[in-house]
Amino acid sequence: MKLEKGKAEERKGNMSKIFKNMIPYWKSIVIIIALLFVQAWCDLSLPSYTSDIIDVGIQNYGVEHVVPEALTADEFETAELFMTDEEADLWESIYEKDGDIYRLQVTSRSELNEIDDTLAVPLIMNYQMSAMEDSAVKEHVAKPTGADAGTLEKDTLLSMRDSMEETIDTMGSSLVKSMGAAYAVSCDKAAGIDVEKIQKSYLVTAGLKMVGMALMIGIVTVLVGFFASRVGAGIGRTLREKVFKQVVGFSNAEMDKFSTASLITRSTNDIQQIQMVSVMLLRMVAYAPILGIGGVLKVVQTGAGMGWIIVLAILVILGYVMVLMAVAMPKFQLMQKLVDNINLVSREILTGLSVIRAFGREKKEEERFDVANKDLTKTMLFTNRVMTFMMPGMMMIMNVLSVGIVWVGAHKIDAGTMQVGAMTAFITYAMMIVMSFLMLTMMSIMLPRAAVAADRIDEVIQTESSIHDAKEPEKVTTHNGVVKFSHVNFKYPGAEEDVLHDIDFTAEPGQITAIIGSTGCGKSTLVNLIPRLYDVTDGSITLDGKDIRNITMSDLRDEIGFVPQKGVLFSGTIASNLRFGKDDATDEEIKKAAEIAQATEFIEAKDDKYESAIAQGGSNVSGGQKQRLAIARAIAKDPKIFIFDDSFSALDLKTDAALRKALAENVKDSTVIIVAQRISTILHAEQILVLDDGKIVGKGTHEELLKSCEVYRQIAKSQLSAKELGLEESEVALNE
């Protein structure tokens, strides 16, 4: 029970995150809601017009009022039979005699409606009396037979009216108006008025009003779609911007927490889910209650007494949808994780395709992808199959609802308490109410998936980087490039043991500091601490005497030219990649950088030279060319500190030697830190650090380390001959 309550609260919290994203667009939302009220008013008016066309335009020849436009003198006198003295005075005041015809003088619709309400009962009774076969009854009650006979007959008529009025009160207002209009039509015909002309005029006017309403609905729908799409697009843009800014600020610790595939899914698929649902919320969810409540009010106005049918239909729909949701909802929540998984597998296969082919693992990887693909497909098929039951079920419920309304309505029409047009309007309103609930239930299925997406995005946005600028950072006043490690220890977040232990050295400008050691000894981890990709656990790193944690990351990284193990290029041109660290680098500067990096030859061989296109990830250049361009990019930045993280391993020995020579000649005043696997790369370094199991076990020049450091000597002997190392064979044998 507690678990279910916790899940409900979690879903509620996730939903609030969706609505929170919409707050900045409140002005557009207010406009949308106002437009939806206009649309609902138009939608709810159309059934009324349809009802009026049937009941008034067709049945009553377009006559809307109980009082006739004209009537004969005999009918004028007879109409007063069932009227009280006050009603008779009103009756006589609204007509003017024109020969043998009395013509109505009132034209105001509001006044006519008030007169209809006052005179409806006596006029309807008079109309019913006129339908009696024995027309002499009227003549008898109209003529006095003695001094008090007229009064006696009048009292009798009024008592008849009282008993008849009870029957009329049981009729609906539309039926009363219809009977009164029938009386007016009979009087108009007798007075020579062309009622067919009235009917045609009414039908044309009502039809034009319906066309106008339909056009208004179309315009409002387009406007709502326009504003809702703008809100959705704005939410998508804002979320992508927030996610991107947050991810760019992540340290390697946060990047390790979120996989690349998951971040891609969150910034694309998840945001699209929220964007789509935001639009649907504004177009459907906001409209559903407006339309539903309006439909209920219209149903109440009809006074048909069939509201129980709609209530029953809604209860059946809610029960039906709840069953479908209970079955499908867990799968909807699982779907996003499966999308993450298939993105992860796809990314690994595509990026590692050459390795897969080299090891002949195509079949195995196909099977791995098939497993991920089938898991997602099965889940989607399951949810789709469940959801396919929704529309047929809804249509069946709505059809049964229509049949029920027609069945009950037919009996009411037969009993004279309802009109055909009113029943038609009632069916339409019932469909609107049901559709409102249907829209809400459809969204209730889509919202949980979007809520999960919102939670996943919010998780990224709310994740604070473990590395951030100091509250009161120090300004970089000197730019010498002296890097000093003071008893640095480091362990990865969540790890129990240190990866680096008591690292203590100084890298001076104008010198090459090389770092060498076995695989996994912590070389790359060490240099990653300098640009603060990670922060030290203990100890400190200073730049020109200032702790790098007290310098803003932008200032710190402006001083560094970093070349990672794996050369990374961006889509664009060679020139745009070389200017990546320095936007205002001149053509001469990037050409000089390319020359130092030994990249000029292959660049000049291309048709477009420095404007040659670079594909995504640099896939259209070789590994060595990519690495040289990455080195040239760092050189073009002209930093005070160069960090080469095993950047020369992709180069042949000749290119490696030429590049190091050019580098030494052109960056004499900079601090150069090189992580290397090859001894030949660092032979002439002023300072070589030997790492073993995260500790510095040797420090000095090549010659000094050959004599003092066993680990370095073992690495050197594994790569170079005794002659190349400058050792005698006897020394090698002795050491062994």
Predicted feature residues:
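Juxtamembrane helix-loop junctions of ABC transporter transmembrane domains
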Residues: 11, 42-58, 213-256, 260, ...
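Short intracellular "coupling" helices and adjacent cytoplasmic loop segments at the cytosolic face
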Residues: 2-10, 58-65, 72-76, 84, ...
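Membrane-integrated ABC transporters
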Residues: 1-46, 50-211, 216, 220, ...
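ABC-type nucleotide-binding domain
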Residues: 2, 29, 65-68, 80-85, ...
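Helix-loop-helix
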Residues: 294, 298-315, 319, 325-326, ...
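Transmembrane alpha-helical core residues of multi-pass small-molecule transporters
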Residues: 35, 39, 213, 217, ...
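An intracellular "coupling" helix at the cytosolic face of ABC transporter transmembrane type-1 domains
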Residues: 24-26, 160, 252-253, 269-278, ...
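Alpha-helical membrane-protein architecture signal
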Residues: 11-19, 27-34, 205-208, 240, ...
